[in-house]
Swiss-Prot record:
It comes from Shewanella woodyi (strain ATCC 51908 / MS32). PANTHER family: UPF0502 PROTEIN YCEH. Belongs to the UPF0502 family. SUPFAM superfamilies: Winged helix' DNA-binding domain. Residues 167-195 are annotated as: Disordered. This is UPF0502 protein Swoo_2055. Residues 177-191 have a biased composition (Basic and acidic residues). Disulfide bonds: none annotated. It comes from the Bacteria. It holds the Pfam family DUF480. HAMAP family: UPF0502.
């Protein structure tokens, strides 16, 4: 799809506000610019001017991804997306997929855990499995809409990145390597720690019992 950085931010904001503030959607140029420049829930944080926002909107309208409307009795033009889940959209997403695409457009590459923790206002994921299944479905589309990045040093989990914007993308690795291996590894380590803790407790109890028995003999 090759959206520019500004275009991707605008689409992400329109997706977000459609769900989180439906009473204020569609958005005026001013409201959309403010949404693009939010300090929270944005990475990177931007400082787009209204002129830059309008230029990106115009480009998106030519791509038929955004449409404008003027309410009855109002001179203010407002904008809404046609990016997905409309009768004019090629892309149709489940609520889970919608939330993930929105978050990836607004906040860049993220781990499944980060996506789950940040998605509350968009979609309530039951668990990490639901996140991973939705990511896999998006990756298996033709063309793919997300991909998995190699695990970074110091990180327990791999991050996922959208493939909708034209920003430089990281190296991709097969998603099949992700879910089970990375979720089971911590679980295995936790099981080992629990077993070790139990053994230490048992040894402490045995030592205490031996000390008491020895003390009885000495007495």
């Amino acid at each position: 799809m090759n959206l520019s950085l500004h275009e991707a931010r605008i689409i992400g904001c329109l997706l977000e506000k459609e769900v989180t503030t439906p009473d204020q959607y569609p958005l005026s140029l001013n409201s959309l610019t403010l949404a693009c420049n939010q300090k929270s829930s944005r990475d990177p944080v931007m400082s787009m001017t209204e002129s830059e926002t309008q230029s990106a909107i115009d480009s998106l309208m030519k791509k038929r991804l955004v449409t404008d409307q003027t309410g009855f009795g109002s001179r203010v033009t407002k904008y809404k997306h046609r990016f997905c889940n409309t009768e004019f959209s090629d892309l149709q997403f489940s609520p889970a997929q919608f939330a993930l695409i929105c978050l990836l457009l607004l906040r860049g590459p993220q781990t499944p855990g980060e996506l789950k923790s940040r998605s509350g206002r968009l979609h309530q994921f039951a668990d990490l499995n639901e996140v991973e299944n939705a990511l896999l479905a998006l990756a298996q589309r033709e063309p793919s809409l997300v991909h998995q990045l190699p695990k970074e040093p110091g990180r327990r989990d791999s991050r996922f990145e959208e493939l909708i914007s034209d920003q430089v993308k990281g190296e991709s690795v097969p998603i099949s390597e992700h879910s089970r291996s990375q979720r089971e590894a911590p679980s295995k380590r936790q099981d080992e720690m629990d077993e070790l803790t139990l053994r230490v407790s048992q040894l402490e109890l045995e030592v205490k019992t031996l000390k008491e028995a020895l003390q009885d003999l000495l007495d």
